Amino acid sequence: MRALFWADIDGLPSTKYEEKEQVMSNIKLVTVALVALSQSAFAQIPPGAGGQMQQIPPERVLQKKAVPPIRIEPVGTPASTAADSVKILVNSLNVTGQTLYSEAQLVAITGFKPGSEVSLTELRAMAAKIANHYRTNGYFVAQAYLPAQDIKDGSVTIAVIEGRYGNITLRNQTNLSDPLASGLLDGINSGDTVAIAPLENRLLLLSDIPGVNVRSTLAPGTEVGTSDLIVDVTPGRRVTGSVEADNAGNYYTGEYRVGATVNLNNPFGRGDVASLRLMTSGSGMNYGRASYQAMFGKTTLGVAYTALNYELGKEFAPLRAHGTVEIASIYGSYPLIRSRNTNLYALAGFDAKTFKDEVDLTSSVTDKKARVLWAGLAGNHLDSFGGGGASSYSLTQTFGDLDIETPAALAVDAATARTNGHYQKLAYHAARVQRVTDRISLYGAINGQFASKNLDISEKMGLGGPYAVRAYPVGEAYSDEGYVVNLEVRLLLSKFFEDMPRQMHLVGFIDAGAVTHNRNPWTNGDNDRTLSGAGIGLTWAEYNNFVVNAYWAQKLGNEVATAAPDKNGRFWIQLVKYF
């Protein structure tokens, strides 16, 4: 206790005598209050404004849409009139119409051997192998066929129609800006070969726009071998959002919380979204975030304002401690890769943060500001490895500058943690869901961060709560550096009960994490901590409709919780309804 609050006051930088006396007076009063609280096993420093922001859960967003359907209108190909049963001597096989592959490559694919006697059926099978090769490599409208021909000297020709775009038409039936919509189709031009990858990329970018639906049609063009592309953009839902409830709040500001998010989609035709998110635990914590973002080509740019106020209760109620957080933000994202199976986004932003903590018992006020620039990458990938799986990952580099404006708090910081000033942080995340059987899947995730120096609590990571080691409370072990690992075995109950609605999983899990409290310790106390737990859970969800998560976690080991009363087990419940 003394190491935290007295912090070698005599070693503070030279200040006015009166200011040093005020520091001593305030620290003594807080110390007296905390000594009274220290009789309980879970006493800790009062959680301030920066720590309160840590309890806000990730925003609940609708999952991205699947690849918009591509309807292909059939087109006939000329066929040979020779009888199927007739066998002919073929000395050479020629391929015409190809540009993407050499003739030798395509002939090799057929397995043709010069001097063979083959039937029309066998020749058609060779043509089918060529067509299948094109389609396997993404040229999904390509055709290969036997044209009507006179066979001379045993020479047979297979004709290839690789498929090229004819007319490209955008039929926009929404208020979405025509230049914006057509700009997302740039790169697909008349005369280009029809390939699935670039087409799906453009359709996905269009379908990512909130408030619109996208479908496309490939119809036979006016010229042989061409397909006209018609892209229809129709109105989607103008208002979306969610309501949520959980028990993942801070123990001292209210564990039970309710919240709601409302999105107004595409109000000005710029692929824009105006959003409002609110969350409350009652008088203990109230949170709100308003944001607006719009598209400029493929780039999304946005602004946001966040506000939070809190008031400590429970054992800290006698302090009459309360505070506020305000954050003004600008942010942006750009899709580096957008496809059916692989996505990668570049992200960046700037936050101007203001923190205020007040303790009425001691008439003390602590003001801090932070300017934070961050940039990163985030992506996901679907694959067929080991029966199929999905991976996600992110990496974020933060450059910040903390300004402790209250002289007394700055003096204490200078003698202890020295968080004031410039800092850097590198945060990482990786996760994978792996299919084992139709009923069983495995999940693994790791989250962590590295720091350049001791960090303000607003930049620290914690080990407790439903997104970390679930056997410990929210706010447990806030630290500068560390990691959390989550491992789960998931059993799909719907496979056992055919009438089971939606997707329901029984989950068994193990969580573990280790942290270094201070990057540069200033006391001789224990600076590291390791926590672990295990438990079971039940998850129930329907795509973009609702989510229910319930977990029971038991501690592994004897580490005592300090952010809330210690318990051997903890129960977490999360409810989300999308609209």
PLM region descriptions:
Residues 306-328, 334-335, 339, 353-362, ...:
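Outer-membrane beta-barrel translocator/channel fold
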Residues 241-243, 262, 274-278, 301-305, ...:
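Membrane-embedded beta-strand positions of outer-membrane beta-barrel proteins
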Residues 240-249, 260, 271-282, 288-290, ...:
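Transmembrane beta-strand segments that form the barrel wall of outer-membrane beta-barrel proteins
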Residues 225, 254-258, 284-288, 324-328, ...:
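Residues that define the transmembrane beta-barrel architecture of outer-membrane proteins
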